[in-house]
């Protein structure tokens, strides 16, 4: 079965929509990239000075080497709490551990010492 579409890729409307979509997608990628840094340089340095692995390092060490990790909610809490809760303070996603697909939820202590915000709870429960 072939899906039919009325979209005309050569039309001005299509091109305008595509450009707007690509611009919005780039914004989401930039926000997700910034959020992946966690609580900022100072918090990360404090965490490392205590001999602790950073949250994304913990996730990487948990997962099977070379296996994919599909992060969900990477931009959760964006624009909330004065920017103090990147990723809502929790890294969540689907990965592979010993060959099994698993859901991973990792608290990010670099974000306000691991404080849970209302969006953290919402993301965690989702």
Predicted features and spans:
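Terminal-region recognition feature
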Residues: 1-126
